[in-house]
Amino acid sequence: MKYGRSTATTEENHLRNCKNDAMIALYLKLRAAAFVDFENVSTAATADYVSWRIEGGRQFANFYIQKKKIRILTLEPTKKYDLGENVPDTHLWTLNYQTDIYSENDIEEAKNIIHDSYDKLN
């Protein structure tokens, strides 16, 4: 019996099913800017989000591609950023920092937040 719609898929299939081409393009620009700096990182996806994981399965960033924004969940960064906020403790999520990006103007800061999350696991 299957519950929910969060079945495993690939990043490519997830992007193919997204409805907003502008947000897909924004995700791909962010990916090109940030992903190249990482070692031993892979992607996984569900119907709801794309996950970046360090080898061994430890997630450091989840990307929810929505109609008007991309919501990114990461580990809480070590420094203060203008983008993002802590997720309430009641959620009990490991990735406890939420960042919303709307345009290319947000990519550099989002990249720094993602790198901070990655560095916490290395």
Residue ranges, per PLM feature:
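A short, surface-exposed helix-loop junction/capping segment
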Residues: 1-20
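Short, conserved beta-strand/beta-arch hydrophobic-aromatic motifs that form part
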Residues: 44-98
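Amphipathic alpha-helical segments
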Residues: 20-40
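Short N-terminal helix-initiation segments at or just after the protein's N-terminus
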Residues: 2-5, 36-47
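Charge-dense, low-complexity intrinsically disordered segments
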Residues: 17, 21, 101-104
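Hydrophobic beta-strand residues in large extracellular and virion-surface proteins
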Residues: 30, 41, 63, 70-72, ...
